[in-house]
Design a protein with these regions (language model features):
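A generic local structural motif
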Residues: 1-3, 42-45, 108-109, 126-129
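Mg2+-dependent phosphoryl-transfer enzymes with acidic/Ser/Thr/Gly-rich catalytic loops
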Residues: 36-37, 78-188
Length: 188
């Protein structure tokens, strides 16, 4: 655990997958496509805590078009919080249509915009489309329900599943390692 905390101390950025991490991975399908996806407010609170502590966030998904609309709408909501409008938090960046091999390239390019390195980035993913990026970041994480092949190759496996608090588990780890008193953070 000490090794993981040392890695978490260095984190200044977080890249998240969509389905299976932000959302549960379950989709209610309708005649014209997906109708609903589920997520957990604890994860949203974890993201707010990280942003309040100065950590920049990106969502990187292979989905595009109508399938990515759920994630795009959620991030738009998060980016309309008063803390973003007032300039206290950086907006969350969304990358859609990003296939497995391109995720590393996209994350690297995004980090350069902030003058950050892969070593200063954490990422959370749940399946093979996330494997490459998880192998390159400073702190690789997976939700509890991630595929075994992913869990074998990450530094931290959250106790909770994707869409059920896994992001909050990772946020708590990072903030604790960095000695952040979450009771002192401005969350709106």
């Amino acid at each position: 655990m000490e090794h993981i905390l040392e890695k978490a101390k260095k984190i200044k950025a977080l890249a998240l997958d969509g389905d299976g991490v932000i959302f549960t991975g379950h989709v209610i399908e309708g005649v014209d496509g997906p109708l609903a996806k589920m997520r957990c407010h604890a994860d949203g609170q974890g993201i707010s805590l990280l942003r309040a502590a100065g950590i920049v966030i990106a969502c990187v998904t292979g989905e595009s078009g109508k399938n990515a609309a759920f994630l795009e709408r959620l991030v738009e909501k998060w980016n309309n919080l008063p803390s973003v409008a007032e300039g206290r938090w950086k907006p969350i960046t969304v990358f859609t249509g990003t296939e497995r091999k391109r995720k590393v390239e996209v994350v690297e390019s995004w980090l350069k915009e902030y003058g950050l390195t892969l070593e200063e980035c954490a990422a959370m993913g749940d399946d093979m489309t996330d494997y490459d990026v998880l192998q390159t970041v400073g702190l690789a994480a997976a939700p509890a329900q991630a595929e075994d092949i992913i869990k074998k190759h990450v530094h931290f496996v959250a106790p909770r599943s994707g869409g059920h608090g896994a992001i909050r588990d990772l946020a708590n780890l990072i903030l604790e390692a960095q000695g952040v008193d979450v009771t002192k953070l401005s969350l709106r």
